[in-house]
Amino acid sequence: MASISAATATSSTKLVSSNSTNPLLPSSTKPSKLILSSSFTPNCSTLFLHSPATPSSTATHRHRRFTVRAARGKFERKKPHVNIGTIGHVDHGKTTLTAALTMALASMGNSAPKKYDEIDAAPEERARGITINTATVEYETENRHYAHVDCPGHADYVKNMITGAAQMDGAILVCSGADGPMPQTKEHILLAKQVGVPNMVVFLNKQDQVDDEELLQLVELEVRELLSSYEFPGDDIPIISGSALLALEALMANPSIKRGENQWVDKIYELMDAVDSYIPIPVRQTELPFLMAIEDVFSITGRGTVATGRVERGTVRIGDTVDIVGLKDTRSTTVTGVEMFQKILDEAMAGDNVGLLLRGIQKIDIQRGMVLAKPGTITPHTKFEAIVYVLKKEEGGRHSPFFSGYRPQFYMRTTDVTGKVTSITTDKGEESKMVMPGDRVNLVVELIMPVACEQGMRFAIREGGKTVGAGVIQKIIE
């Protein structure tokens, strides 16, 4: 079976730009923390990105060539599956930790050890010493199977991080014990809160560079206070200190190191024990009708077209009929293959990152931003009413008010589409002509293209490379 793995989350969409501060990738998304009603099934994120207000440079999309390998046998669902990822400031050691994790857990079976430069895969990333893409690796502990996303930490590419952050059931916040929390540490914690990452474990890295134990304790205290300030339970979150680099070097020298044989490798095991115990297995929305937002599309010669993404809800099996909804006319197709991590799957369920092979669909018929759904369960719409929070200047939002007729970008699931604000109502129900930064308002929005959306769905509003608002759909109008 040709591989239609969603381990292709080392996405084929590549962002390269000479001095790009505004990556233009649409974001994959998940719930934010605008709690407005308990009946919502939130899907879209509010993406709080504090990118510098520099002129938008010309970012070019370059597509990496796909190497399609044969599926390596069947995916066995023996353990509960959890999506996690590393977040934190640039050069604090996220990718190094990811490499150390895969190598330490390779002895558990089913986890291929990955070297640092295999995770930090693309040449542009290594050349600048900065991760620009999101790479997914898999590994297992005794109790669970993990899909791990390595998120970029560089401020210019925070936008690209969304693709990874939105797929997390929990996160490992990597913070250098030598430097303490930095601007992007804060940004990523805020972002995790907004895109609905429910739980977090902290790894204080570079412990070997801190001579004084008291300094490390001060950094730990600072991290706990920072987490509490963003409404995470800072006092309860497990914080493990260690050195990802020294652990990785020890594992490279001797891949069969067991627990108790090296203090730095033991810290990696200790971290995963904390992740196992502290990050709960998420309740999947498996009972609901199937829906998957398409993140990427590619062709396999002789087999057909594959759509990859994260199953948001429900289940899908080979032979199921699905609708392709949004951006163009809705059409139906049959799923002829389901794979995860280059292994054949009987059934994909909510939370899985999968590739679906679709019958009779050409690559040009389908694109990122569309959704695959159980027939008749979701329809494309262009007009809706939403409750929106407009970010203040201090939160990275607009400095000035906007008026009726305002045309920003609306980010929904994996798509971004221009929309026009046609009417403004205050939260007291009075009509208004103007929206100030910091306001909470009801807006009626008209999109220029139909998008699969529904009541309770969350979205972000962006303009000029920064997030200016966050909202949730109250009512579909047309």
UniProtKB/Swiss-Prot annotation:
Coiled-coil region(s) at which residues?
none
One GO BP annotation is:
mitochondrial translational elongation
Domain tr-type G intervals: 79-283
Region called G2, residue ranges: 129-133
Q: What does this protein do?
A: This protein promotes the GTP-dependent binding of aminoacyl-tRNA to the A-site of ribosomes during protein biosynthesis.
Q: Which domain of life is it from?
A: Eukaryota
Region spans: G3: 150-153
Q: Do you know which InterPro entries this protein is assigned to? A: EF-Tu_GTP-bd, EF-Tu_GTPase, EFTu-like_2, EFTU_2, G_TR_CS, P-loop_NTPase, Small_GTP-bd, T_Tr_GTP-bd_dom
Q: Which UniProt keywords apply?
A: Chloroplast, Elongation factor, GTP-binding, Nucleotide-binding, Plastid, Protein biosynthesis, Transit peptide
User: Where does the record place the region G4?
Assistant: 205-208
Q: Which GO terms describe its cellular component?
A: chloroplast; mitochondrion
Transit peptide residues according to the UniProt entry: 1-69
Q: By its UniProt entry, which CDD domains does this protein fall under?
A: EF_Tu (cd01884), EFTU_II (cd03697), EFTU_III (cd03707)
List every stretch annotated Disordered: 1-31
Q: Which GO terms describe its molecular function?
A: GTP binding; GTPase activity; translation elongation factor activity
For region G5, the annotated ranges are 243-245
| PROSITE patterns tied to this protein | G_TR_1, G_TR_2
* Record's protein name: Elongation factor Tu, chloroplastic
Instruction: Give the gene that encodes this protein.
Output: TUFA
Query: What ranges does the record give for the region G1, renumbered to this chain?
Result: 88-95
Give the UniProt subcellular location, in the record's own words: Plastid, Chloroplast
> Which residues does the record give as GTP binding sites?
88-95, 150-154, 205-208
